[in-house]
Amino acid sequence: MANMPRDDAAARLAPAMDTSTSDLPSFGAPTPIRFSRSNQSLAEDFMALSFVLESGRQIPRISRFEGPITVALAPSAPPALEGELSRLLTRLRTEAGIAISATAYRTNSPAKITIEALPAERIAAAVPQAACFVVPNASTWQEFIRQRGRVTSDWASLTTRNRAAIFLPADASLQEMRDCLHEELGQALGPLNDLYDLTDSVFNDDNFHAVLTTTDMMFLQIFNDPSLQSGMGQADVAARLPAILGRINPTGGVVSSINLANRDNRAWSNAIGRALGPNMPEGQRLEHAQAALNIAQRSNMRDARLGFSYYALGRIALARDPDRAAAAFASAQDIYQRLPNTDVQRAHIAMQIGALALARGDMTAALLQSTTALPIARRSENAHLLASLSMLRATALEGLGRGSEAQRSRLEAYAWGRYGFADRSLMQIRLGEIANLAPNATQAARN
């Protein structure tokens, strides 16, 4: 289940952009960032993802689809989503080795996985705070509504997966629909949990990663390995992991005993969830963000949760206390620099640090931050971040008197903005806000 990113909440309420437009920018052939992982860490993360639900409930046994898997888009899905699904299915076949293919939508003979697009308000009414979600043993929204609360819709009760339905927001940007597609299809095919301490996975509610990563593909390859099967418990799966990982990640080293202890700090998770949740006054959100940071420090967290605590605090403090936000972003960047596989996190923080530099008139620093982060945003296929960084770079170049370069970067910002934002007017407002951070900013971003 994908939580609603706070900075994109307004995008879901805006009129939908025409995502069927043929000249929307494309990322082309995927070139995912390659993350380096030990087999020991993969084994422990896999077990934590596979035997616990996001709510904290234990899953007694794994369940999965057995045999070839078919996926169908319901007629409500925008045409542009078909191309995104095709790219994703190709990756799942080539990177995760899953026998999966698209098929035509049929009500009388449904695919194993059906993808339906609905108004965001209907999704939020059914599952508050979720931008999108996946449910078992259903193929339509009506079927999901009929069986809500029954044991058939409980992931933890399954012994095998036969059908699943994914519900995406039809009135969102193409990027948000695609991001939902990646996370929900990933959960339909594999683990059901999210872990905040993962740095290289979409199975993490920090929303840094937009698409399934190479690490996620390894998790899915493990989950669907022939030596595993539906109904296996923790001990059986753990016993088979060393051989599986030795085969699919031969440079990852050996797996010793696997630590199965619960890694979730529920007090921290609750505090960060409240800080990022909707419909809460900013002052209270700031209090919850500070509480999450305090818990992380008291608990001696040295993983991504500490970095994310600082990042969340910085985002929330930005409007009312830029100095406090700047200090929080600097701390977050320092922590992520010490952790492996955090290029994407550092690109997001670079956007914030660069924007603060722009606001104080330091065009050189803003240009450095944006130029460094842009290649990571492109490889991680985050159009929203690409558009924002491109506008940051354009404004810095303008301030340095490099007008022709600024115009090229500005045009790139608007091109990717059409993919990353739900509405053209919202895109212009957001990108204009970045341009207007600079002292004596030109109004070129509004033209």
Feature roles, as predicted:
Residues 329-334, 368-375, 398-421:
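TPR/TPR-like (Sel1-like) alpha-helical repeat modules
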